[in-house]
Regions:
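Extracellular glycan-recognition regions
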Residues: 22-230
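Bacterial Sec-dependent N-terminal signal peptides
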Residues: 1-23
Length: 230
């Protein structure tokens, strides 16, 4: 068994997994924050992770993205993603405060529900074609849809993904109190899924995102319109 060290600021022990889903590697790892432990690294994510005082910075190299264009001409499966396994038979909520460094169009910080490279959901704070920063959601089932949502003028945003086993909701907040619904999906994903965080720089030369207050709980929100309650 080959063993590699794969973190910039901590010793994250990584061993290759048998199934390689991503173009640049799919490995087990152990990166621990106060309320979540990431156990899987896609596309070298653990090698580009820095943890300090409970905060995590994840860097993306140039031209990294996860997107499968509906026209079938583009498929980029190279974004660094840190994941943790989740029992989808039970409720869950993943929340994080995200502060991207925007340098180029489509730079973003994201949250994921991940099954495989052509079956996933992501929610992002992204820089659009006009240079505005906005919420974006993408659902990939073979190919990717792409949805632009509200413009965000603050430098940071709280993002939340929650499921009661039947419905998945995407939400954002500027104050961690009042939540805005972005999108609802039917939860028709497998019994075991992966959830996590990512950074992307599809057109740029790389960027980084600061993730704070990353929390995974085994409860869902109670109001899927307001995004509140346990």
């Amino acid at each position: 068994m080959k063993i590699m060290l794969c973190s910039l600021s901590l010793l994250a022990l990584c061993v290759p997994l048998q199934a390689t889903a991503q173009e640049l590697g799919d490995k087990a790892c152990n990166i621990t924050l106060p309320e979540i432990t990431f156990t899987r690294s896609l596309n070298g994510a653990a090698d580009h992770t820095k943890v300090s005082e409970g905060k995590l910075t994840l860097a993306s190299e140039a031209k990294r993205d996860n997107f499968r264009d509906p026209n079938g001409k583009l498929s980029n499966n190279t974004a660094p993603v840190l994941l943790t396994e989740v029992d989808n038979k039970k409720p869950f909520t993943l929340m994080a405060k995200i502060t991207p460094t925007f340098l180029k169009t489509y730079d973003a910080g994201t949250l994921y529900i991940w099954v495989k490279e052509d079956l996933w959901l992501k929610m992002a704070m992204e820089m659009d074609e006009r240079g505005e920063h906005r919420m974006v959601s993408v659902r990939t089932t073979g190919t990717s849809d792409d949805n632009n949502h509200d413009v965000i003028t603050a430098k940071s945003v709280y993002m939340k993904i929650s499921s009661d086993t039947k419905t998945v909701g995407f939400y954002y907040s500027l104050d961690k109190k009042s939540w805005q619904l972005i999108r609802l999906f039917k939860n028709d994903y497998p019994e075991t899924i992966w959830m996590g965080i990512s950074t992307q720089s599809p057109l740029g030369e790389g960027t980084s995102v600061l993730f704070e207050d990353v929390i995974l709980t085994h409860q869902s929100i109670s109001d899927f319109r307001l995004g509140q309650g346990n």
